[in-house]
Amino acid sequence: MVMKKSKSKTNKPNKANKNKNKNYNNNTSEDVEQLDQLDINEQLDSLFENINNNNNNININIINNNIDIDINNNKNYIKIIEFKDLKKFNYLIPSDQTSICGFVKYLIALKNNGSREAAIIFEGIKNFERFKELYVKYFFIGGKENKNKNKWSKLRVDQIGEMFNHLGLALTCCDEVISFKGSLMSELISLACTISNNSLYKKYHEQIFVFLASYFKQERKNQECELYCITGLKYFPNNDNFHYIRAFIHFDQITSKQCYADCKSGLKINPNHLGLLFIKAGVLLDCRASTADPISQVLAHYVYINKAHYDHQCVPEVFFYIGMLSINELDKFQLAIKIYRYAVQLERVAIYPNSSRLRMGKNTLEQILLSHKVTWEMLSDPEDIEYHSPEKPPANTLLENKDKKQLDEKHNNKIKEQQQQQPETTTTTTNMDLNSNDCSNNEVLNNKNNSGSSSSSSSSSGSSSSCSGSGSSCSCSSCSSNIKINDEKPYKITLIEDIYFVFDENSEDLKLEQKIKDKIQQINRFQEKFYANIREFQKEEINKLLLILQNQKISRQQEEQLKKRQQQQQQMEEQKLLLEQLQLIQTTTSTTANTTIIPPPQQQQQQQQQQQQQQQQQQQQQQQQQEEEQQEEQQEGEQQLQEKQLQEQLQELQKQLQEEQLQQEVEEQEEEENEEKEKEEEVEEQEEEEEQPQQQEEEEEEEEEQQQQEKQEKQQAGQTIQELLKEEPLQMQQQYLQETNENQQLYNISCGDKTITYYSLLDEID
C-alpha cells in the first residue's frame, strides 16, 4: 500500500491543522497542568533560547495580535491565529522550514485542541531545538561550521549521547519535526550506525535505535528498519515505538499476520497508542476483505490513510461509516461487532472523552446491531475485547463510565422484560467466536422471529438453526463472511551469520531456513576461494616488486660506474691539454731568452687573450662539474625516496598477509572447536537415546523376573503346606506353631471343614 504523506505549509493554516503529531505518549496530568500554568512567552523563550546561526534569518513578530513570520527578508505576512496578552518579540532561529511548521502547529494545537496535544508537540519541538543547540555549541564557531573531518572524535560520550537522546525523543513525539535532509542527516546516520554497536553508548542505545528505525521507515528501507526494531525489542522490550514502526512496515508490505502480531503486542504495552489502534483496524479490514469485495478494500485504505495523516476530526466518522457499510451493504455482522468494540475502545482513550460524533455513531451502530438480534452479551464479551485498561484511568472519563454502567443495567432489564413477555420465542445466548466458521455456534444471528412464525421457531429450538437465506441476504456467520480474521501465528526470529531472519512457524517458510544456510555456506566457500586468489595475487605482486628493486639496484651501479669512467677520461684530457700548453710556454720562453727582440704589442695581446680564454674554459668546466654533482645528488635523493616507498608498500602488504593469516587461523580454530562441540553433543545425544531403550528393557526384565519369583514362591508355599497337611497330624502342627515366634505374621487356610493357621515358611523352605 502506498501512503500519501502530507506536507505542512505555513501559508495554509487549515492544512497545518490536520497535520498533527503522529505518535502519542502517555503524558501525566501533572505535566499538562504545569504547561497550562506557564505563560506562552515563557514557553517560546525556552523553545528558542541560546541558539544562533547565520544560515537562515527567521524573525517572528506579533503585531496587532497576529503572527508575522519573516524568512530571509521575504516579508511573508501570515495571519495564522489571534492571541491576547502577547507582546512583540523577535527570535533568530537556526533552522529550515520544518521548525517554523512545527512552531505553527504548536500554536494551532494550543489554541484549538487544548493543552494535551500541544504538550506533546511542544515536547518534540523542544527536544529537537535542544539537539540543534548542542550541535551549534559543539560544531559551530563564529557562525561557520568547523570543517575538521574528525570533529565527532573530539566529543565525549555523554555529549554525543545527549544529542541523540534529544533527537530520539523529538522523533517519538513528532517525527515531522526532524524530517530534514542533507549532509547533516547523513553524518548523523553514519555516526548513529557506528555507535549503535559500541558498548560505551549503552545508556543511549534505546533512543538511537528509535531514531535509526524511524529514519529508515521514512526512507522505505524496510530491512534496515526491521533490523533495528528487532534489536531494540531484544534489549528494550517495553518500548511500544518499536512495535509501532514494525507494524507500519508490515502493513506497507501487506504482511498482515506479522502486522497484527506487532499491533497486539504493542497494545499490551500501551493500550492507548492511537497509531497501533488504527493499523490494527486496517489490518482486520484488509485481512477479512476478499478479492471480490472492493468496498472493504477501500475502507481499509481509508482507515490507513487517516491513520497516517492523523486527522483526528475524521476518526469517529471513519469508524461509524465502516460499521454502517459492514451491516447494510456487506451484511457482515462479525465485522460490525468488531468495529463497534474499537469505537468503545477509542471512547475510553483520554483524547476522545467528549467526542459527540463518536458517541452518536457508536450508539446508532449499537441500536442497529441489537435490532438484528445481536445480544448485548455479544457486544460486551470481555473475552473477545482486546482492550487492556490502564492502571489509572483518566479523570475526565470516570463520570462517563458511571453513566455507561447505568445504561448497561437499564438495557439488560429491558431485555429481561421482553423475554418474559414473549415466552414462546426461544433465543439462545451463546458466546460468538469471531474466528469460527461454524453455523451452529452463532444461532442468535439466524433467529429472526416474526409475530406470525412463533410456532416454527419453537419447533426448531431443539436442533441447530438452519440458514434463512443465501449469500448477502443471510445473517449467519458462515454464510455472511467468506472473510476470516487471521489469528496471530507465532513467528520465529533466527540469527544466521549476524543477519536476522523472520519466519512464520508451521508453514513452508521454515524450509527456507535450510536453503538460506546452504546459500550462506556457498557464499563462505566462495569468499575463501576469493581471498585465496587475492593472497596469491599479492604474493605475485610482491615478487614483481622485489625483481624491480633488484633491477633498479643493478642499473644504479652501472650508471655510477659509467659516470666514474667519464670523469676519469675528462681528467686525462684536461691533463694532456695542460701539458701541451706548458710545452708551448717553455719553447716560447727559450726563444725569447736567446733573442733580445722585443715582441710586438700584437703578440702580447694574443697571449693575454689566450690566457683569458683558458681561464674562462676552466671556470666553465668547474661550473659544469658542480651542476653535474648537484644533479647526481638530486637523482640519488629521488631514488632513495622511491626505495623507501617501495619498502613501505612491501611492509604494508606483509602486515596485511599476516593479519589475514591470523584471522584465518582464528576462524579455523573457532570452526574446529564448534565442529568438535557439535560432534560431542551429537554423540552424547545418541548415547542418551541408545541408553534410554536399554534401561527400559532392563527395568521391564527385572519386573518380569520379580513377578515370576513371587509366583514361584507362592506356588512352593502352597505345595509345602499341602504336603504338611497330608503328612503331619494336627498335634504336631500345633506344637510346631507354639515353638515359632509370636511376632511373625499368621495366615488362615481353609482345607475342607478345617481351618489351619500358619506363618510364612518361605525362609525355612529356601
Swiss-Prot record:
Entry's Gene Ontology cellular component terms: cytoskeleton
Compositional bias annotation for Basic residues: 1-21
Top-level taxon: Eukaryota
UniProt region (Disordered), positions on chain: 1-27, 413-478, 658-727
SUPFAM superfamilies: TPR-like
InterPro entries: TPR-like_helical_dom_sf
Low complexity composition bias: residue spans: 418-430, 441-478
Compositionally biased residues, Polar residues: 431-440
Bias type Acidic residues, positions: 665-707
Protein name per the record: Putative uncharacterized protein DDB_G0287113
